[in-house]
Amino acid sequence: MEFAEMIRTGQAQAELLRGPEEPPLRGTLCITGHHLLLSPGPQATPDLWLLLLRNVDSIEKRVAGDSGTITLRCKDLRVLQLDIEGVEATLDIARSIEALSSLESVITSFPFFYRPKGLRLGDAWHFHPPECYYKRVARETNAWRLSEANEDFSLCPSYPRAVIVPRAVDDSAVARSARFRQGGRFPVLSYYHAPSGTVLLRAGQPLTGPQKRRCSEDEELLRAVLAGARPGARGFIVDTRSPQAAKQARMTGGGTEAKAAYPGWKRLHRPLERGRPLQESFVRLVEACGDLEQSMDRWLNRLESCRWLSHVKETLSTACLAAQSMEQEGACILVHGAEGTDSTLLITSLAQLILDPLSRTMAGFQELIEREWVQAGHPFQLRCAHSAFSHARPKHEAPTFLLFLDCVWQLGRQFPLSLEFGEGMLLALFDHAYASPFGTFLCNNEKERCLCEVRTRTHSLWSGLSQPKEQRKLRNPLYVPNPLAIWPSAEPQSLRLWQGLFLRGTRPPEPSEVAWEKVWQIVTDQEKTEGSQPTDSASEPGP
């Protein structure tokens, strides 16, 4: 069906209410195939208001007399109200938005039509390939190699074409290990920690099943991991499921690594919620944050009952366990749950932020997102199909990536000088994960992105964020490089609600933006002052 067939009315007169303390905009409302536009007129500021229709999570419409109201609850947690002249126009616009905001076809989405000035197709897609990370690993150790056994995605559709595996294991053994792991997700290198000579790996669960099957090649691969580490190294398998859940998985074909089959490896269960419970926690938190008339006791009870901060605590605690085992005990770590595409990636990416100073730079953080989330197979299209307002029954939705961003925000709050990027970067990543003009978060894995030709037909988010006008909003002006590991506290007293995100629909953004700009101005003035001062040698008198 063509876009024009879904647009029931071309335009209407409307008034837009955008949020607290923001003046309403009145003008002509128009609908295109991908956007809702409001043009207030030549004298108004802004001169054009624009909303990507993919950002709409739910629509509510009311009619009274000869006018109507449409409330749009957006995936980025904003709530917008449109007061429209004419009942028929109101209903037609609501139906058009409903149809256009729920298109499922990837290739008809806006990134395939977005052509901004100053950007070229293909730019920035090559910034963070696995080969670049492998080169850094190869400078530190020769125990690993770059394998292209997955060149045609036949081993694992959710892995990239090239992955890093132990040098002592050939591609035929890798292929047999892939058949033994859920989704073909055989153990691959996620991070090499040079100070201790240990590694962080990720995988899917082993398919042992009720018969307790084994795979000699999979066992060989994990033996090679320990052999390639420092002498006497041991390993921990961090299973993000409870022991009971792991046993239940074995009855349906999954399972865990048998102790006898993997000597040198010890299994640790650190259960993390995923799927529907996590989505419901997110929904309850957003509902509580949107209620402006509740008492203090009611608010605190709802904040506790939604358990969102408990998920943050458990995630940070598990990431700290993995990082501490590598840094202080010299152990290798393998992380997996069931599929290995959700809580597994949470832990591997957070552990790297804790340990690796490079991951805390702007470029390093972008590489981390690309390598540990996009290329590692997090199913963004399924997980971010709806946000917290949708009335549709959740199927595959889960705010796993949001939970990661919240944990990173907690890191930034506890270590305000150690991250080169600021809250603006985290908010931008949240927004683009759910609705974006760029192609980075499209599809569910690399195979799908190749089939849709995402890299040749859409722009990379990283090219958009690298523009000078964006950098000031994304960078942390207080950043000071920190070569050490940063150890966050996961105690309840140390965790805070991420107000910049969860309260963005109920508090005006301007005070925060003004404060952020003021900090930048102070830092800029200080740098100018220091730059204009004479050096010690120049100020010393001559002989």
Swiss-Prot record:
GO terms for molecular function: protein phosphatase binding. Pfam families: Myotub-related, PH-GRAM_MTMR6-like. Coiled coil: none annotated. One of its GO terms (biological process) is negative regulation of autophagy. GO terms for cellular component: cytoplasm. PROSITE patterns: PPASE_MYOTUBULARIN (PS51339). Residues 124-502 form the Myotubularin phosphatase domain. It comes from the Eukaryota. InterPro entries: Myotubularin, Myotubularin-like_Pase_dom, PH-like_dom_sf, Prot-tyrosine_phosphatase-like. Probable pseudophosphatase. Belongs to the protein-tyrosine phosphatase family. Non-receptor class myotubularin subfamily. PANTHER family: MYOTUBULARIN PHOSPHATASE DOMAIN-CONTAINING PROTEIN, MYOTUBULARIN-RELATED. This is Myotubularin-related protein 9-like. It comes from Bos taurus. The gene is MTMR9L.
